[in-house]
Amino acid sequence: TRKECPLDIMGYDIDKKTIGLARENAVQAKLGNTIHFQQQPLSSLSSRKMYGKIICNPPYGERLSDKKEVEKLYKEMGKVFGKLDSWSHYILTSHSDFEKLFGKKASKKRKLYNGNIKVDYYQYYGPRPKHTHKFFHEELTKSR
């Protein structure tokens, strides 16, 4: 038998309406009780957990009026995510200067499309959790 790893999924956004829509989508996907949603600013993001993953699709700043705000957000993301340096970060954006604004070159960058918008998927790999290897070794040993 396969032992399930605990899964802790959280969704954050500063906008209350966006959180409501995300919650509705989770319920429709039958994941309503699996994901914890919370309205909060990016600057409040923190965790006591040693390892984790952040996956985000921030605003792209496609409209000229939003560009400066988005660039400010990307700089803040770099500072906030930098405090979680043992975590992996995955960011989807169309902004060509994202790495410069974020303050770090991605471990890997993939070109994708989000609808008809050409985007880049920036992957920043954190260290692998040491206990993961032990968990899988124990599972392999049990199954033999």
Provide a role label for each language-model segment.
Residues 1-144:
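Class I S-adenosyl-L-methionine-dependent methyltransferase catalytic core
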